[in-house]
Amino acid sequence: MRKVSPGLVCIVLGVVLLLAAGGLGAYNRYEDAHAGAEAQTVVADLQQKVETPEPETESGPLDPELPVVEIDGNEYVGEISIPAIGIDLPVMSEWSYPRLKIAPCRQFGSSRTDDLVIAAHNYESHFGKLTSLTAGDSVTFTDM
């Protein structure tokens, strides 16, 4: 039986690791593109379903619960728009890891009580470009 040199083992292991890294990178790009396409489809549906707010007739306290719209089995509370980086995405009513693969999610709080926290992946099509924002850039959340 022939002895395998340590150098050959290192070369083969290096090639395998490079292929694995390339595959992981390709999968991440696919997931990013898929999430972006799905979010844009939902945003178009949301914009058609957005209710026109009725003028308030009572001077009572505002209900902090955000109204939801259901699309394809997921509930959405609004839309986030960041024109400086070309972001216009739906926001899901509750967060979970599987939901984050579709669109940004409300982690907690409400826009009506000024404590809304939105979480999203760092996909290029989601919040991946936030680092390029500058002070004064507009960020708008529109609820249902």
Question: Predicted regions: what is each one?
Answer:
Residues V4-M144:
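Solvent-exposed, non-transmembrane regions of membrane-associated and secreted proteins
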